[in-house]
From Swiss-Prot:
It comes from Chitinophaga pinensis (strain ATCC 43595 / DSM 2588 / LMG 13176 / NBRC 15968 / NCIMB 11800 / UQM 2034). Residues 26-272 form the AB hydrolase-1 domain. SUPFAM superfamilies: alpha/beta-Hydrolases. Monomer. Belongs to the peptidase S33 family. Its EC number is 3.4.11.5. GO terms for molecular function: aminopeptidase activity. This is Proline iminopeptidase. It comes from the Bacteria. The keyword Oxidoreductase does not apply.
Length: 299
């Protein structure tokens, strides 16, 4: 456990190291906001065989970490500060520190890369756009129109009544939105680590930043926008988009073009969790990027 200093005291966060490579150390940031590391266990089937050292990490309040119940920390600045404290404790530096972030973790990774890039070797942003506004645009203008009209009417009716706790709402969103855009594997074949992560989500964190639904951000992230600052990311950066993602892959491609040393990986048959529904292509693309960066710095 790593002690994290906060304005309300010191609390412990959980990390776990897999592998041993002094030149390549990857810290994995989970999505949500509020999801634990569990669903990132997919990396265990790929990274160890390539000699890549990596770290699981549960943000304060999530998963195996302490749960102080301090909602004042549910913001971007506090999360970035926490990642820096974790980096220091793990003794990662610009010679070996690769930061991976999926979804919300990608937003956190970009913010960290701008503030602390002297500590960073490379950045991997998976399935995340550059603003809450862009997320909402794509969901409302493109994705919800792909849902059956009767299903969408019911979802919208429940939303209008703020009846998000209705079992019907979660059933319809899971069956018609999640199964299309979050993970395209049949629902009864979703991997155990993914189901486990869903069962352990830090709901207050999710509600504060995202809001009650994936069908649009109405929490504090709706005003978050890093678009104009992408050019400040100086380290090599890989951006990953997918054909069936809830995030617009064309926008993610644009993001990669704003970064001086950006690359784009497109998972044509994947969704928000391409790490599961287009796994070999996704994982091999990340491994290739890590090896490229490592080899270029060795020359």
């Amino acid at each position: 456990m790593i002690p994290i200093k906060t304005p309300k005291g010191v609390f412990n966060v959980w990390t776990k190291r897999i592998g041993n490579n002094p030149k390549v150390k990857v810290l994995l940031l989970a999505g949500g906001p509020g999801f634990p590391h569990d669903y990132l266990e997919a990396f265990e089937s790929y990274f160890p065989g390539e000699g890549i050292e990596f770290y699981y990490y549960d943000e304060l309040g999530n998963g195996n970490s302490d749960k102080p119940g301090d909602s004042s920390r549910y913001n971007v600045a506090s999360a970035v500060d926490e990642v820096e404290q974790v980096r220091q404790a793990l003794k990662l530096d610009s010679s070996n520190f690769y930061l991976f972030g999926h979804s919300w973790g990608g937003a956190l990774g970009m913010e960290y890369a701008i503030k602390y890039q002297n500590n960073l070797k490379a950045l991997i942003v998976s399935n995340m756009v550059a603003s809450g506004k862009e997320f909402n645009r794509y969901v409302q203008q493109v994705l919800v129109k792909q849902l059956p009209p009767a299903i969408l009417d019911t979802i919208n009716d429940l939303s209008a009544r703020n009846d998000y706790s209705n079992p019907k709402y979660s059933e319809l969103v899971t069956r018609h939105f999640y199964a299309r855009f979050i993970c395209r594997l049949p629902l009864d074949q979703w991997p155990e680590p993914l189901n486990r992560a869903f069962s352990k989500v830090n709901t207050p964190y999710y509600l504060t930043l995202q809001g009650p639904s994936e069908l649009g951000i109405i929490g504090s992230l709706q005003t978050w926008d890093i678009s104009a600052r992408l050019k400040e990311i100086a380290v090599p950066a890989l951006f990953i988009g997918a054909g069936y993602d809830e995030m617009d892959p064309e926008h993610i491609k644009w993001m990669s073009q704003q970064v001086p040393h950006g690359q784009f990986l497109y998972c044509a048959n994947g969704s928000h969790l391409s790490m599961y529904d287009q796994q070999p292509f996704y994982m091999n693309g990340i491994i290739r990027f890590i090896k490229e960066v490592n080899n270029s710095s060795a020359n």
